[in-house]
Amino acid sequence: MKFDYKKYFINVSSFILYLFPASLILSTFLSNLFVTIISLSFLFYIILRKTKLPENIFFKLFIIFWLYLILRSLFAENIFFSVRSSFFYIRYIFFSFAIIFIIENNKYFLKNFLKIFLVTLSILLIDSFIQFLFGTNITGISAKNLEDGRISGLFGKELVLGSFISKIIFLLLSVFCLTKINYQKSIFLGTFFFSVIVVLISGDRSPFFITILLSLILLTLLKSFKLKTKIIFSLFLVSSILFTIYSSQVIRDRVIKHTASQLINDSSSEIKIHKLNIFSKGHEAHYIAAYKMFKDNIIFGQGPNMFRLLCKKNEYYVEPQSCSTHPHNYYIQLLAETGLIGFSFLMALFLFIAGNLLFKKLSNFGILISLSLMLNLFPLIPTGNFFNSWVANLYFLSFAFYIYGIKTKLLFK
């Protein structure tokens, strides 16, 4: 009997993708392993079947971007360190197109993926509420042992709960629109509501504020719900947010007082307006250091992932807080490390997504998956490292569904 690699690849990769959301919570190593297995298996399938590489404009542009990263790394001050970040970045585009291939060839994938994804998120949300209400989650992690008494849920000591939920919630809701399940609207609204509340109690302020902003856009554009339902839901959500903030001293201090104190550098007993900071004193120092690197090589930058090595140099040093593994903003990082050329790829992608959302008639799926990517790539908030694998795992998952929507025309009405 002839071995059917296509069937084998689809079945194994589908199973891995069902577990992928959980792997993002439990282990960065595991999620990276899953991405590598799927991308290499898909590449092997292409070679084995002697099929053409995806003839898609996004695929071609990504390859050009990747080749540029490799080339720039070869001229970086620390070639090995820079190449190590850029060379393996290629796996993400094969990961995204493997997902598209699986969706198209496994008619049960979307429903199974949605159900398992929903169960995974529900467990995470319940655990987070337990930690918030009782101080300790189901794995024994106490909020008292975390910074400012924040909530981390199943992420343990990693304070990324709010960031994770904000990045996946619109993706999950978009998959709702591709499937038909019983009580879809009730589950949709319930998942959305509890996710926003957990982002709030996590203490992750940037994800919370951007989630609220995009939620307003969502409720404005979404056509599935009557105006009355939208108004009632919005009032209930706002009331719940205000109640949560003012009933918890920890959240109130974190969301309101801490935000104000970081935005305003109060070095004396009086608050002086001329000492306003960009997000915080530390963030501003990162951005200034990155700007110095950008000015030093406007077109090509300093090389992928080189910020952490160069920020200690006298010509880029600002103050002790200015040096970090990355400048905490994707766009500023790409300007510093890849110059205007690398920056233009990401900015063009964001403007393309935003342009479609603003000027074209999108389906409910199109609206949600667009918001998912915009939240992942929003330029005006602090972010992680652009070349960080955990971060890339998240936005290339959303990217796969976005390309699928364009390819099948499900993105548009």
Task: List each model region and its residues.
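Transmembrane alpha-helices of multi-pass inner-membrane enzymes
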Residues: 37-43, 215-216, 349-350, 369-381, ...
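A membrane-periplasm/extracellular boundary helix in multi-pass inner-membrane enzymes
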Residues: 126, 222-273, 288-296, 304
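Loop-to-helix entry and N-terminal half of a specific, functionally important transmembrane alpha helix
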Residues: 12-20, 57-63, 187, 191-193, ...
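Selective detector of the "anchor" transmembrane alpha-helix that sits immediately C-terminal
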Residues: 337-362, 396
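Long extracytoplasmic/lumenal interhelical loops at the membrane interface
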Residues: 270-338
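Alpha-helical transmembrane segments of multi-pass inner-membrane proteins
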Residues: 20-21, 66, 70, 94, ...
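Membrane-embedded alpha-helical segments of multi-pass membrane proteins
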Residues: 16, 26-48, 86-98, 160-169, ...
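Transmembrane signal-anchor hairpin modules in multi-pass inner-membrane enzymes, especially those
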Residues: 1-84, 101-111, 115-118, 175-186, ...
